[in-house]
Amino acid sequence: MQSTANYLWMLSDILGQGATANVYRGRNKKTGDLYAVKVFNSLSFQRPADVQMREFEVLKKLNHKNIVKLFAIEEEMSSRHKVLVMEFCPCASLYSVLEEPTNSYGLPESEFLIVSRDVVAGMNHLRENGIIHRDIKPGNIMREIGEDGKSVYKLTDFGAARELEDDEQFVSLYGTEEYLHPDMYERAVLRKEHQKKYSATVDLWSIGVTFYHAATGSLPFRPFEGPRRNKEVMYKIIAGKPSGAISGVQRAENGPIEWSGELPATCNLSMGLQTLFTPVLANILEADQEKCWGFEQFFAVTNDIFNRIVVHVFSLQQMTPHKIYINTYDKVPDFHDLVYKQTKIPGQNQELLFEGRRLVLEQGRLAQHFPITTDENPIFVLTREMVSVIGLRFDEIVIPKPISHYDLDVDANMAKAVTGVACYYCRIAASLLLVLDLMRKGIRWLSELMKEEYNENVHRNTEVSLKLNFCNRTTEKDLKIYEQLMQTSVESEVYAIHAKLLNLSSTQEGLKSSLQEVKNKLTPGGTLMDSWINTEGIHAADRNVEKLQVLLSLITEIYCQFKKDKAQRRLSYNEEQIHKFDKQKLCLHAAKAYSLFKDECVGKYEVFRSKTLEWMRKMIHVRKQLFSIKSKCFDIEEEASKCQHYINQYQEKMSPKMFAAPSGMKSAVNPIYSSPNTLVEMTLGMRKLKEDMEGVVKELEENNHILERFGALTIDGDFRNVDCI
């Protein structure tokens, strides 16, 4: 045990080891509270005195929630060496988090955002105080749990830190080689002399590597044998990285470098966040310091990302979930643009559904006032046009094959890899289940939407039919009355209008048969019935995710034992036999997990996807058919209105002739009516006209009554209204 005036610690209770110091878990002598005590070793005292004091001076200047706090600088009682008493973070470092098999393929999106936000905030505080860190890596980012249960990450280990303004440079070498800027790597690792100086932006390179590591679970630049086994190739990769690339991997010995400007498919981050973060990585992982972003631009872009809100969207026809990162002040057109960038569905073609209803967003509505969405309750987007069924983006990773011979180190590493893949299977299986649950929900809603569209068409078609019938009867009666009363032929235009009305009626009758065809597809037994969604694909009742989790727990248990075996370095005969039996069990559990994932989860998902493609084709055809009927119905109604308008004008034109002054009437009537009963015949004709007009009024009233009753009718007796938000 060692101690200072106010703190004590056990030498066996070590938290971390570095080149110049060890960190122990210590306690305050009076309160018993836990602290991290940094004790410097003999190598530390070989440094110049000003360098030794630099860490103390830097920590004294800093005070931020995302930087490990310095509480005291005291002397160890026996050696009188300085020790730092700092804030204790009980959840270890980001490196420890990334070493967990659960995070083998990167942190969950929510945790990645916390890491990146906290690191950016901590770095911003450093730059405000004119300090560079020079050794940023996951091992120097500590984690604790905040009062709200969320992680809080803090920068630590300022042994390499120094004061340096943005326009200043330095030549001394610090850092961890996997995270070093290429210029520093060349001199510090390869020991090649050059005259280059370094600026504060070298921290940005280290941040880029750290963020990539956090997002994917792997380092971005990897020689075949590993970064520390082939340093020449490592330098070749980082120094020769093309602009825009964010990773370079050598897959085989002496093989080519595979460059990529995207994060891998195994990454946990949504495409929405990847689209925003990938340019950040590309511009800070830039070997040319002239091309690399400065801190000001880095802080501006990252804070813009952190200040956005997420709108969860599900593209029904593409079977793809999306997260739309949007500014709170952005409006509906901006939202449609962002949806287009991820789905390639043009804004004018996007139809939105939310909680089973049409979602109509006014153009001026701010994003902060959109409906609250989640992964399980997103806004559904669809279109009347045919789009490809894409599905969830993932890789079918194969379980690593174990080696046959006995090797504790290799077995522990293999068990860790198997555990990581099993965790990945669990995550993807849960995602596939969620996608299919959303598909089932969306297809039911879409079926209801098509029924609504059908009912609207039937309603409109009935209105048009009644209007045409009325126009036809009115025209026929007018023709008959005018010919009887006026005893002369009617203008040819009236006959043409009558013929046009008859033709429109014939076309409208054709629409009825088209509607009946659509109805047959939508009703039970039709080709667009959605009953198949209840039988195909993965279901929660299958409990595949739970089965995978059981296998994962068995695999994890063996992995933990293998870690202990590795730490022992040598096992007794009985322990060795148990180890071999566990290895066999590990292979058996892994094979079961792979079979369950591939056959039950991915296999059934693919069947559902192919069925979806077939159903969507039929759905698009029916919706286009309904749209065509609606368009034709509108055209017929428009033409009927023109005919009705002409008839009304003709009636107004003929009325003065029918009811002209007696003198005028005589001249018109005398040649026609030679009978002495002319006046009686005219009176009877006028009465007949009055009766016909009263009949027309009565028919109009009856038609209106029919329309009012029809307004409540649908296929299933439930007419749903548009939901306008």
Curated annotation (Swiss-Prot):
Q: Which InterPro entries match?
A: IKK (IPR051180), Kinase-like_dom_sf (IPR011009), Prot_kinase_dom (IPR000719), Protein_kinase_ATP_BS (IPR017441), TBK1_CCD1 (IPR041309), TBK1_ULD (IPR041087)
Q: Pfam families this protein is in?
A: Pkinase, TBK1_CCD1, TBK1_ULD
Give its localization. Answer: Cytoplasm
Which residue ranges does the record assign to the Ubiquitin-like domain? 309-385
Q: Which reaction does it catalyse?
A: L-seryl-[protein] + ATP = O-phospho-L-seryl-[protein] + ADP + H(+); L-threonyl-[protein] + ATP = O-phospho-L-threonyl-[protein] + ADP + H(+)
Which enzyme type, at the first EC level?
transferase
Q: What GO terms describe the biological role, i.e. biological process, of this protein?
A: activation of innate immune response; innate immune response; peptidyl-serine phosphorylation; peptidyl-threonine phosphorylation; positive regulation of type I interferon production; regulation of type I interferon production
Enzyme Commission (EC) number: 2.7.11.1
Q: Where is the active site?
A: D135 (proton acceptor)
The UniProt keywords, alphabetically, are: ATP-binding, Coiled coil, Cytoplasm, Immunity, Innate immunity, Kinase, Nucleotide-binding, Serine/threonine-protein kinase, Transferase
UniProt domain Protein kinase: residue ranges = 9-306
Query: How does the entry describe the domains?
Result: Comprises A N-terminal kinase domain, a ubiquitin-like domain and a C-terminal coiled-coil region mediating homodimerization.
Provide the family line: Belongs to the protein kinase superfamily. Ser/Thr protein kinase family. I-kappa-B kinase subfamily.
What is this protein for, i.e. what is its function? Answer: Serine/threonine kinase that plays an essential role in regulating inflammatory responses to foreign agents. Following activation of toll-like receptors by viral or bacterial components, associates with traf3 and tank and phosphorylates interferon regulatory factors (IRFs) irf3 and irf7 as well as ddx3x. This activity allows subsequent homodimerization and nuclear translocation of the IRFs leading to transcriptional activation of pro-inflammatory and antiviral genes including ifna and ifnb.
Output this protein's name.
Serine/threonine-protein kinase TBK1
Query: Which organism encodes this protein?
Result: Xenopus laevis (African clawed frog)
